[in-house]
A protein has these predicted regions:
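Hydrophobic positions on the alpha1 helix immediately C-terminal to the Walker A/P-loop
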Residues: 113, 117
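Conserved NTP phosphate-binding and transfer environment spanning the P-loop NTPase/kinase superfamily
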Residues: 91, 218-362
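Glycine-rich phosphate-binding loop used to anchor ATP phosphates in small-molecule kinases
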Residues: 94, 164-223, 273-287
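Single conserved hydrophobic/aromatic residue that forms the stacking wall/gate
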Residues: 1-6, 11
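Hydrophobic anchor at the beta1->P-loop junction of P-loop NTPases
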Residues: 100-102
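Conserved nucleotide-sensing/catalytic segment adjacent to the nucleotide-binding pocket
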Residues: 129, 138, 142-185
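Charged, amphipathic alpha-helical linker segments immediately N-terminal to NTP-binding catalytic cores
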Residues: 35-81
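Conserved lysine of the Walker
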Residues: 110
């Protein structure tokens, strides 16, 4: 449990019942780096006088919504700049970072974060180059299958780890490498003359769900890697007793993004969510504390903005389908927030990845 007393942070470990067996208490798993992120953002909430949703709504209703947006966006930009500066300083100390690894769960904003980090790295005189793990899938017939017999593309072993590490090592030695392109129609890698050679100013940016898994890059020296974990960690509570689950933040983002860009209804996104969460529990969360730094992509004001976009999508879920209960719960939840329009949100905001209107290309 986290709470603020005066200007100090109080931290208490509380064991909670197991989901499958309420008679058994869960073991306490220490997550010191994530705790530091919560402490930092709770401290800022306290400074701004926002301890719960009621405080936030009052600030919006008294004409301070734009101020909240500006401060929240500035805090994120400052944090991204600090991460870029830390990467650069490591090179000055003789441990030049050659590979930045970015991981995080679904709809955490990894893609926009990587683009904004690349901008900040360029201000330090570095040349970021993105590497896509999607191009390193094994041939389709070699892809592992899940318990239902379907191709499991979220598995680490759906990737050609040997080729990936061989090419990374060659790049870090200064050799020229022809990068593969995965043809999803044929289910095979192709080579189209996409060659790459990096110099001392180039830094590779790798974003993906397996980026923090040590099995992904076992042959790359630890000193050459900088690991970042990105997630939307909600740090405002409904009241003094009810915390907002961080997964609700990401689910609302995904519902809006899937509707805007992938043609999926809220019903379809909600139905897929349990399998997405299962993949996160298996492939992402166990490795989050491996990160050198954690970045909180949640914005203090975002539920108020998400409400305006999510309400019409959620209300379209039929009452007679299994997903209606979850849609109704989310609708009831977002109505606790005073709605805020997105016109004041800058085009580089992480939220633009889901709402649209971003100045970045995806």
């Amino acid at each position: 449990r986290l709470s603020l007393v005066g200007s100090e942070m109080c931290i208490r470990d509380r064991r909670i019942p197991n989901k499958e067996n309420p008679n058994v208490l869960e073991e306490v798993v220490k997550q010191e780096k994530m705790l530091d992120v919560f402490k930092e953002h709770l401290r800022w909430n306290y400074i701004m006088g926002l301890s719960n949703v009621g405080d936030f709504n009052l600030a919006c209703e008294t004409g301070h919504a734009t101020d909240l947006i500006n401060v929240a966006e500035a805090l994120q930009e400052k944090k991204i700049a600090q991460i870029a500066d830390d990467i650069y300083r490591r090179g000055e100390n003789g441990n030049r970072v050659k590979l930045v690894l970015i991981s995080g769960p679904s709809s955490s904003g990894k893609t926009t974060f990587s683009k904004r980090l690349s901008v900040q790295l360029m201000t330090n005189g570095l040349r970021p180059y993105p590497i896509s793990l999607d191009n390193y899938f094994v041939d389709r017939e070699d892809t592992p299958r899940d318990e239902n017999g379907n191709y499991d593309y979220e598995s680490l072993y759906a990737l050609d780890l040997e080729l990936f590490n061989t090419q990374l090592q060659a790049l870090l030695r200064g050799e020229e490498v022809e990068l593969p392109r995965f043809n999803f129609n044929l289910g095979k890698k192709e080579y189209k003359g996409d060659k790459l050679r990096i110099d001392e100013h180039t830094i590779l940016i790798l974003e993906g769900i397996h980026a923090l898994n040590p099995e992904l890059t076992p042959q790359i020296p630890a000193a050459s890697k900088y690991k970042i974990y990105v997630s939307a960690l909600t740090t405002i509570s409904l009241d003094d007793h009810n915390w907002i689950p961080t997964t609700d933040n990401r689910l609302l983002r995904r519902i809006i993004r899937d509707f805007n860009y992938r043609g999926y209804s809220a019903q379809e996104t909600i139905s897929r969510w349990p399998s997405v969460r299962a993949g996160e529990d298996k492939w992402i969360f166990p490795y989050q504390e491996n990160a050198d730094v954690m970045f909180n992509s949640a914005l203090l004001f975002e539920f108020a903005v998400l409400r305006c976009h999510a309400e019409p999508i959620l209300t379209s879920v039929p009452r007679n389908c299994p997903e209606y209960a979850e849609a109704y719960r989310l609708l009831k939840f977002i109505k606790y927030f005073t709605p805020v329009q997105d016109k004041e949100i800058p085009p580089t905001s992480l939220l633009r990845e889901f709402l649209g209107g971003s100045s970045f290309k995806y």
